[in-house]
Amino acid sequence: MGRRIAVVLFNLGGPDTGNDVQPFLKNLFRDPAIIRAPLPVRWLVARLISTLRAPVVKQNYAMMDAGGGSPLLRETKKQADALQAELAKKLPGDEVRCFIAMRYWHPFTEEAAAEVQKWGADEVVLLPLYPQFSTTTTGSSLSAWHKAYKGKSRTICCYPFEENFVSAHVDQIMAAWERAGRPGNVNLLLSAHGLPESVVKSGDPYQWQCEALAEMIAGRVPADWEVSVCYQSRVGPMKWIGPPTEEEIARISDQGRNILIAPIAFVSEHIETLVELGEEYRLVAEKHGAASYTRVEALGVHPGFISTLTGEVLAALGMKETIRSCAGGRLCPSGWSGCPQAELKQKAGVRITETAG
């Protein structure tokens, strides 16, 4: 009899209906990985932000769904089904089941952990649908998981440079360019969710991974395109990493150029791709005179992306180590102390001196 292998997909989560928007936002902003303040302050800030932002955010969700909910769970289920089917082919002697663990809405991490425990998994692989590691996303999900599930598990921390993943991005970008009529004078904007500068300065490797991925993509698109990285979805008065996506769109549009904009940190369609990139920033481009504005679709169930996830799970199952990146061992240069492999070695009393690769 083969193994029971549970693959747990981490993602952000999203409200099911308009009535869920405010409690979803409250869950998000009271996470200590997001608002780095003492508990009483964090709860007050979460209540304030969720109350102030809920009306506008509700309108944005209503643009995507008549019930005012997020498509993220639906899209994640499609990815889970595709991954489970591929793993079943690769592991015919084992029983593989994919579970979804959302951080800020149902099915919560705690619910997924209870399901995995009830199923009686022999192996558990934690697979974030965040390609780049950040303490604010994967790090937060891992913390919640280890509080909820006391059994052993293997972690895939990041896979931003995996070959099929990079190729899938390029494929989506070129397909969007074809749909746009193959325009010239192209600026390709590779947009990722922003982070406060203080998070990056504390050792979070997210920005480094995003920008290294962007360099890989830039080397595979037409040489006459101008390619740049930008960061969206800023919240609050803190200083964030940049340049901001909205400002880059305005700057390039003022030159009358054709804009292709691709999400490189979001792998599923949701409010930040469909509304922010698809609608709000389109208006900015039109206002500033862009020749055209084309949004590249998120990877979704692109075969290259599902192949990436499949390969990472298989590799994790074959390793003695409990944490894996797409490089096998540690991916990040030694300066990024927020890397989970660095933290693991620090806990074991190992001095960190190695570099990327």
UniProtKB/Swiss-Prot annotation:
Pathway per the UniProt entry: Porphyrin-containing compound metabolism; protoheme biosynthesis; protoheme from protoporphyrin-IX: step 1/1
Keywords: Cytoplasm, Heme biosynthesis, Iron, Lyase, Metal-binding, Porphyrin biosynthesis
This enzyme's EC code(s): 4.98.1.1
Binding site for Fe cation: H193, E272
The UniProt record lists the keyword GTP-binding: no
Gene3D superfamilies cross-referenced by the UniProt entry: 3.40.50.1400
An annotated Gene Ontology molecular function: ferrochelatase activity
Domain of life: Bacteria
Pfam families reported for this sequence: Ferrochelatase
Catalytic reaction annotation: heme b + 2 H(+) = protoporphyrin IX + Fe(2+)
Single GO BP term: heme biosynthetic process
Chief location category: cytoplasm
Enzyme class, UniProt record, top EC level: lyase
Compartments, record wording: Cytoplasm
GO cellular component terms, semicolon-separated: cytoplasm
HAMAP family xrefs: Ferrochelatase (MF_00323)
Family per record: Belongs to the ferrochelatase family.
Function: Catalyzes the ferrous insertion into protoporphyrin IX.
NCBIfam families: hemH
Record-given protein name: Ferrochelatase
Gene transcribed to yield this protein: hemH
